[in-house]
């Protein structure tokens, strides 16, 4: 929410952030690895910039991107020391340009009549002034980083570029044990949740009141998004409605889901749960979950598989090559 914050950078970065890095003349990078999800096409990343890279790991310096000023140091110590040398300068013209980019392509999602991810994030922002949000891996991870307002008291934990599906629930368990009394919300997809759902037993045993949100679109959503945008809608092994006889006719009404009933499964572990299908039921569901002081609580949200993550940089593209919608 800081006025100078302009959003995520990279493959699912905000338009303004990607344009700012592409057009800047000086780039301070603190603790990043410059992985491919951040840079896009390497030789066109920040083409006009002198790059200052602060990292405590010597091996990360100039590994992917050549940097002009390498600084091997603890980030906090380096920033504190550098702040002593900062002088005021006029950035009005540059900030005006950034504001133009922000207004040109603000982050947005389609408004769904029943419910969409943005409705859920709006409730989280409104209802939880203090919380720890832990995400799994997939579309919900990117959407959370885009639409949940991160503040001093509302923190976000994710596994970054490691791609560790199944991280959400055990990550939330660790966060709750380390921060008793603080609301901990894990956000997972129906695919990632099933990779470590057995850890509900641990959460019940340790009496951890985690709120576990499942964005259930009956798909491995991020992979499906790639198949839709870049592989001619040839959906393979991503639809969790598909059986052995499926011939890829996505949307067949008679095709049954191959995911469990998450609410009954939660109850079988001794946890609690509720299924939400309408936006007016989101806020009451979170209020009910907050009443559970010693028991994990699952909220399953039924999500449209066409709720995709935008913007998106084309594979092999530059930060300028953003798909804004399709």
Task: Locate the predicted segments by residue.
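Generic enzyme active-site microenvironment
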Residues: 53, 134, 187-188
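Thiamine diphosphate
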Residues: 5, 11-12, 18, 23, ...
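Active-site diphosphate/adenylate-binding microenvironment
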Residues: 2, 99-175, 181
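Glycine-rich, N-terminal phosphate-binding loop of Rossmann-like dinucleotide-binding domains
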Residues: 30-31, 74, 137, 302
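Structural signal for hydrophobic packing residues in well-ordered secondary-structure cores
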Residues: 25, 31-34, 79-90, 102-106, ...
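Phosphate/diphosphate-binding loops
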Residues: 10-60
């Amino acid at each position: 929410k800081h006025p100078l914050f302009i959003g995520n950078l990279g493959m699912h970065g905000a338009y303004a952030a990607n344009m700012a890095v592409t057009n800047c003349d000086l780039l301070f990078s603190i603790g990043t690895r410059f992985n491919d999800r951040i840079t896009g096409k390497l030789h066109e990343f920040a083409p006009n910039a002198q790059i200052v890279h602060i990292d405590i790991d010597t091996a990360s310096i100039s590994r992917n991107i050549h940097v002009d000023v390498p600084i091997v140091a603890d980030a906090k110590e380096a920033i504190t020391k550098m702040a002593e040398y900062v002088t005021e300068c006029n950035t009005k013209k540059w900030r005006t340009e950034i504001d133009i980019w922000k207004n040109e392509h603000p982050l947005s999602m389609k408004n769904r009549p029943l419910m969409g991810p943005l409705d859920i994030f709006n409730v989280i922002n409104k209802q939880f002034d203090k919380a720890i949000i832990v995400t799994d891996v997939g579309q919900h991870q990117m959407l959370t980083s885009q639409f949940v307002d991160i503040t001093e008291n509302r923190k976000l934990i994710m596994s970054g570029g490691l791609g560790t599906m199944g991280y959400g629930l055990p990550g939330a368990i660790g966060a709750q044990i380390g921060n008793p009394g603080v609301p901990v919300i894990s956000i997972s997809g129906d695919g990632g949740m099933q990779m470590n759902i057995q850890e509900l037993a641990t959460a019940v045993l340790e009496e951890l009141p985690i709120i576990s949100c499942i964005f259930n679109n009956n798909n491995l959503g991020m992979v499906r998004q790639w198949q839709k945008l870049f592989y001619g809608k040839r959906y393979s092994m991503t639809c969790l409605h598909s059986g052995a006889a499926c011939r890829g006719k996505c949307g067949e009404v008679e095709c049954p889901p191959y995911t469990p009933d998450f609410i009954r499964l939660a109850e079988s572990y001794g946890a609690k749960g509720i299924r939400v299908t309408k936006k007016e039921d989101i806020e009451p569901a979170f209020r009910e979950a907050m009443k559970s002081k010693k028991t994990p609580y699952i909220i399953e949200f039924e999500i449209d598989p066409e709720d995709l993550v935008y913007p998106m940089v084309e594979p092999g593209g530059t930060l300028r090559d953003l798909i804004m919608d399709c």
